[in-house]
Amino acid sequence: MTDIEIYRKRLERIEELLLELSEYSKKGAVIIVEGKRDILSMKRLGIDGNFELATRHSLFNFSERIAKLGCEVIILTDWDRRGDILATKLSEYFGNFGIKPELQIRNKLRLITQKEIKDVESLYTYVSKLRSKTGVSFDQEDNI
């Protein structure tokens, strides 16, 4: 498999995950991220939705408030040590409130990008780089 084929496959898998994330968002799910730049990256990738910053509150109170909304919860923290700890704690707290948060999108993004990037805010730049290397323009893929 050539480098371009590898990049194309990686881009395809990321685009599928972004489409899945977009679908969750359209259904009213709350997407939990760590910072404002994460939100900006997601919006630049075509994901509009209800974003919440997990790092601005007591995690217990934050989880309780989100759980009371009664909607699906997607944890999209960074895939560094801090993001892993935050995802684990949030998942535990949400579990205490009877909510099973979606973690698979985060985990799959982590696997696909593990040696390249470690955070959500870099995702837009990474996808742009993959699109450039594979010759896929944003116009061709902006159906998210």
UniProtKB/Swiss-Prot annotation:
Gene3D superfamilies: 3.40.1360.10. The lineage of its organism: Archaea, Methanobacteriati, Methanobacteriota, Stenosarchaea group, Methanomicrobia. Signal peptide: none annotated. Mg(2+) 2 binds at D78, D80. Keywords: Magnesium, Metal-binding. Mg(2+) 1 binds at E34, D78. Belongs to the UPF0292 family. Its cofactor is Mg(2+). Residues 28-109 form the Toprim domain. CDD domains: TOPRIM_RNase_M5_like. This is UPF0292 protein MA_4098. Binds two Mg(2+) per subunit. InterPro entries: TOPRIM_dom (IPR006171), TOPRIM_RNase_M5-like (IPR034141), UPF0292 (IPR022972). It comes from Methanosarcina acetivorans (strain ATCC 35395 / DSM 2834 / JCM 12185 / C2A). PANTHER family: UPF0292 PROTEIN MJ1624, UPF0292 PROTEIN TK1411. Transmembrane segments: none annotated. GO terms for molecular function: metal ion binding. HAMAP family: UPF0292 (MF_01095).
